[in-house]
């Protein structure tokens, strides 16, 4: 492989696809110029199917638009889009108890709350990234304040409803891993000891509790001290989620001058998760596996969703940067070839989100409450910059 040519071509591809395809689609069809914020329930051609707004995506697109401004080009429309999402969040997305909503109507009228703090995490990274883009430090402080609020909610018994009753005490991979990225993104705008302290706690928990060498797997749910829970949910492996965790840890390793222990931990998770996730028969990263080989109960267990492919593309490139091992470039090529052959719509902009196991399209919409402008554009921005860093 001609590494220089390979990385140069991909760098240009990511930028072009983002600037000419992904971002214009969401700016034209998603951005709500009347109420502020962003719609995500868009059909294949961009037609609005549902005016319900995902609070996750007010933060996620607020982040992406500012992240693009900081890393792709200083487009004032992108900066304004980020501000629109943040303004909408501040005006409409917080309940009186400080806990954010999950869904709101187009004008911000509350619809639904959930027992998580992911809305808060996405809002915080939008504010921190906007602070970097705009130079307005008040948004960095808002992000840090919101992070402190997240920690309060997580650490105050009874504030958030637990997933299970006390008969089965457990801890989840999702919040543990997402705090690594949330804290790191905020730290880029405002440094505070609480951020690196939480990253250290999360990484310790991932290493000591969630990584299970006996299965060569990082599990989604374990006991309070990492105990293996031998039921369907305790045996669950979500390969795409684990691979996302791997690159979060690689990003932290880079921040710490390529900390060897973190690189080894992250590449171990990536290697394990690739082995569980890659579909040898049809290609692509599969949704769910059982660490003991039993059938998974989730009805989408053998489907190919957009986001695990995106996270694998990032992680493989990051692992190559960290190690120089060309096996990760081969991994990047394998997942990229499959992803780009199956997910981009050849007739309309943007990508499909949901494929059957064999790579055929399950449904053609470009967005809903869970799919919107986040994983795909983040992959393109991050990988464009990674390629350029590696090329020097």
Regions of interest found by a model, annotated:
Residues 1-392:
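Glycan-recognition and catalytic cores of secretory/periplasmic carbohydrate-active enzymes
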């Amino acid at each position: 492989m001609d590494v220089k040519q390979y990385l140069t071509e991909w760098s240009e591809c990511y930028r072009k696809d983002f600037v000419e395809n992904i971002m214009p689609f969401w700016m034209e069809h998603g951005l709500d110029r009347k109420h502020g914020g962003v719609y995500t329930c868009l059909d294949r051609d961009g037609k609005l199917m549902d005016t319900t707004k995902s609070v996750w995506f007010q933060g996620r697109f607020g982040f992406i638009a500012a992240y693009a401004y900081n890393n792709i080009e200083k487009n004032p429309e992108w900066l304004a889009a980020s501000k629109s999402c943040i303004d909408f969040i501040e005006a409409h997305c917080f309940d009186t108890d400080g806990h954010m909503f999950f869904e709101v109507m187009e004008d911000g009228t509350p619809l639904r709350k959930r027992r998580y703090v992911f809305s808060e995490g996405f809002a915080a990274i939008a504010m921190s990234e906007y602070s970097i883009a705009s130079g307005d430090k008040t948004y960095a402080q808002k992000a840090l304040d919101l992070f402190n609020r997240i920690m309060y909610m997580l650490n105050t018994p009874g504030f958030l409803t637990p997933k299970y009753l006390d008969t089965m005490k457990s801890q989840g991979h999702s919040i543990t891993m997402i705090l690594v990225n949330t804290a790191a993104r905020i730290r880029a705008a405002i440094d505070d000891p609480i951020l690196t302290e939480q990253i250290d706690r999360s990484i310790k928990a991932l290493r000591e509790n969630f990584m299970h060498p006996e299965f060569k797997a990082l599990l989604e749910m374990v006991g309070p001290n990492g105990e293996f829970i031998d039921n369907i949910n305790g045996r669950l492996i979500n390969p795409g989620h684990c691979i996302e965790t791997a690159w979060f840890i690689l990003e932290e390793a880079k921040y710490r001058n390529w900390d060897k222990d973190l690189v080894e931990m992250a590449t171990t998770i990536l290697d394990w998760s690739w082995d569980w996730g890659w579909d040898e028969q049809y290609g692509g990263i599969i949704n769910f596996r059982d660490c003991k080989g039993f059938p998974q109960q989730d009805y989408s267990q053998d489907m190919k969703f957009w986001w695990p492919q995106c996270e694998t593309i990032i992680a493989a490139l990051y692992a190559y940067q960290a190690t120089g091992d060309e096996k990760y470039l081969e991994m990047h090529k394998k997942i990229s070839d499959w992803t780009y052959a199956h997910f981009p719509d050849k007739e309309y902009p943007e990508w499909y989100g949901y494929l059957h196991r064999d790579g055929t399209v399950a449904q053609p919409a470009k967005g809903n409450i869970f799919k919107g402008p986040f994983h795909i554009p983040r992959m393109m921005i991050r990988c464009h910059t990674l390629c350029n860093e590696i090329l020097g």
